[in-house]
């Protein structure tokens, strides 16, 4: 289904143009700059003056209100507009993109086929879709990526180089897996925020201040995640390690299981997946 990305071994950065300058675009740009990408390799097209000034403050000089030759001929063109904007933001690029430009879309719900139609692209291998998540904003993201079989190794390497700047990259076997990874890691941060929010609320009910309860919940989640990353043991075994027979943790875990938490999580993830599929159909 998916494969963790391996070191791509590129020594130079491609030229990268962005259509859209929202949070995810800024996250990728920030990650690229931290990775040593020259500011001159990056250009951005955004409609608002405030966003252009923000990007200028990041060191990006090539920030414009409309696409030009840099965008049409970039090695990578990153589409980072909102789904409802594709009908107006993409047609100005139609039939002007260089055949050598690889299009990387971070737009949720818009299929490669739809993008190809909007951009006037005949080779679907020119388009790569990805689904980052919000921890990408601090370089701790997970990004699922899918490209057609005709997308060559050089293009895949450039895409990996860009996305590794914001976290871990997984290549997906099918475009349909974009819906699956949306349900797990794309929407996943909100699931953990909800659990931390609920745990914090329980702490407040026990008498802790909101500040202390929030810190306890967040640090516990962070510590558990880091332990899971560094330990060779499975998640189930790590849980068992904390759950002494007849102890306090076992009582809590049993309450979760009896309350249907595992099934509820599966149901929630499936609901996210189905909504992702629906959005793709609505935007087709």
Mark where each language-model region is.
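Catalytic, metal-anchored helix/loop core of enzyme active sites in primary metabolism
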Residues: 182-184, 196, 282
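NAD(P)-dependent Rossmann-like dehydrogenase/reductase catalytic/cofactor-binding core
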Residues: 2-5, 12, 218-284
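Rossmann-like NAD(P)(H) cofactor-binding subdomain of soluble oxidoreductases
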Residues: 28-29, 49, 55-58, 64-145, ...
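Small-residue helix-packing motif on alpha-helices
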Residues: 42, 52, 70, 209-216, ...
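Short pre-catalytic strand/loop immediately N-terminal to key active-site residues, enriched for Gly-Thr
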Residues: 16, 128, 177-183, 235-240
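NAD(P)+-binding Rossmann beta1-loop-alpha1 motif at the extreme N-terminus of oxidoreductases
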Residues: 1-68, 72, 204-206
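Internal alpha-helical scaffold of NAD(P)-dependent oxidoreductase catalytic cores
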Residues: 14, 114-126, 142-180, 193-230
